[in-house]
Regions:
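Small/polar (Gly/Ser/Thr/Ala-rich) solvent-exposed segments
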Residues: 50, 73-92, 103, 114-144, ...
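Amphipathic alpha-helical coiled-coil segments
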Residues: 51-66, 143, 147-167, 177, ...
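Periplasmic alpha-helical coiled-coil/stalk elements that build and connect Gram-negative outer-membrane
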Residues: 33, 144-259, 363, 367, ...
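Bacterial N-terminal signal peptides
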Residues: 10-20
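Bacterial Sec-pathway N-terminal export signals of envelope proteins
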Residues: 23-79, 85, 106, 116, ...
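Membrane-embedded beta-strands of outer-membrane beta-barrel proteins
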Residues: 111-113, 316
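Acidic, low-complexity, intrinsically disordered peripheral segments
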Residues: 2-4, 26-28, 84, 415-439
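Transmembrane beta-barrel architecture of outer-membrane proteins
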Residues: 37, 106-108, 153, 198, ...
Length: 439
């Protein structure tokens, strides 16, 4: 990343901070809100924040279910059955009797206990659940981080209007003083009533502008209040953040920073896919378990008996899905492709982020240059306005010409105030783009 005039921009950010904080003090009887606390309030009051704890609780329940797979499973069953034919002995006893008689109606009930000894899929499934939790929580944090940029926009919209109110208030105060002087001159016969009327009309127009600014600012503050869950009135001031040092450091290290939550989300997604591959492979491994059954029925284990008997049995079972026709390997290959897709998404995100950083840096440079001219323009407009004011008091120029110069000075102050806020906004936007907190 190319570094451009960081020291100059730092100086101008300090100037913007000082000037706009002064404008904020023009609003009496209110509280002061800073950008960092409002950003945090937006995150803290967003309903989606509770998803982090809900996801944790959900995963804990699922992990308990997975861990229960290691515990013995107990099954109780029973059945009654009638069959049309049964085994018969191939020969008879002397006298024509049968060696044994097998009943056609059978009854059986019992209790079965199964205990897993080895099952690789249990650990793999638990690891997959934890990886899914990390991915889901990273996605929630990414969503919540987007609130910071929304707060930035609402905050600086209101701050721009606040700064303009300060400039307009100074103009109204000056016009009120000029109107009083002109009325005195009219009373003394050294000025025409039309000149006083012209100044008064302009003063009323400026007061209209002030009321319009207040209404627009109330709307901006209302949006900011909704975003942050705070109660913000029009008497409250917005304190501009001092971002000079942070912006300077960020511009020097922007190429190496990976603070955006999206980077963590990409990493968690890759980890989840890797755990999913492990879980797929674990399904192919043999499973070993023991079993035992006790029961009562007719017949018992002696199938040639026609008496009700109790019985018991136990053993070891091995299960192995030895041949899956390549389905498991294809699934793992599909997951590997998904990892490559995630890598491509991350590369595209990094590219877009780089473009945004370049744009923010260019905006900082542009506003720094404009502010250097703004200061000179305002200084010249003040000189011209003061000179015209003195000549107007002497009756050399008309009220119309004086008001034209006053309007030009107001527009110059408006432009400077707007550029000062825009410079601070560009600094905050750069920090947010890089994933850094505004402090």
């Amino acid at each position: 990343m190319k570094i451009r005039s960081s020291s100059f921009i730092a100086a101008w950010l300090l100037t913007a901070h000082a000037v706009i904080c002064t404008a904020g003090q023009l609003i009496p009887g209110g509280r002061s809100f800073d950008l960092a606390s409002l950003q945090q309030a937006a995150v803290d009051t967003d309903p989606r924040l509770q998803q982090l704890q809900l996801l944790t609780t959900q995963t804990e329940l699922r992990l308990r279910n997975i861990a229960a797979g290691r515990l013995p499973s107990v099954t109780v069953d029973g059945q009654a059955q009638y069959q049309s034919d049964v085994p018969r002995p191939a020969f008879t006893l002397p006298g024509g009797g049968l060696l044994f008689t097998t009943p056609k109606a059978t009854y059986d009930s019992g209790l079965r206990i199964d205990q897993r000894i080895f099952d690789a899929s249990i650990n793999a499934q638990g690891a997959l659940e934890r990886a899914q939790l990390a991915e889901q929580q990273a996605r929630v944090r990414t969503t919540l981080f987007s609130l910071r940029q929304q707060v930035n926009e609402a905050f600086f919209t209101a701050a721009t209007l606040q700064a303009r109110q300060g400039a307009l208030s100074a103009t109204i105060t000056d016009l009120s003083a000029r109107l009083d002087e002109t009325n005195e001159r009219v009373g003394a016969g050294t000025a025409l009533p039309a000149e006083a009327a012209s100044i008064e009309a302009t003063l009323l127009q400026r007061r209209q502008d002030e009321e319009e600014l207040r209404a627009t600012r109330r709307t901006a503050l209302a949006r900011l209040a909704i975003l942050t869950g705070q109660t913000i009135s029009e008497n409250d001031a917005l304190a501009m953040p001092d971002l000079a040092a942070a912006v300077s450091r960020a511009r020097q290290t922007s190429g190496e920073l990976r603070a955006r939550p999206e980077y963590d989300l990409f990493a968690r997604t890759r980890e989840r896919l890797a755990k999913q591959q492990d879980a797929t492979a674990a399904q192919e491994r043999p499973r070993v378990s023991t079993f035992a059954r006790v029961g009562y029925g007719r017949p018992g284990l002696n199938f040639v008996s026609d008496q009700f008997e109790s019985y018991g049995l136990g053993g070891v079972r091995v299960q192995w899905n030895a041949w899956t026709w390549g389905s498991s390997s294809r699934e793992r290959e599909a997951l590997a492709i998904q990892q490559r897709i995630v890598a491509a998404d991350q590369a595209a995100f990094a590219k877009g982020l780089g473009e945004s950083i370049e744009g923010d840096s260019a905006t900082l440079d542009r506003l720094q240059a404009m502010l250097a001219l703004d200061d000179r323009i305002v200084a010249l407009r003040e000189q011209i306005e003061q000179s015209t004011q003195a000549r107007f008091q002497e009756g050399v120029v008309t009220a119309s010409e004086f008001l034209d110069r006053s309007s030009e000075l107001l527009q110059a102050r408006f432009a400077r105030a707007t550029h000062q806020v825009e410079l601070a906004q560009a600094g905050a936007r750069l920090l947010t783009t890089l994933g850094l907190e505004v402090r």
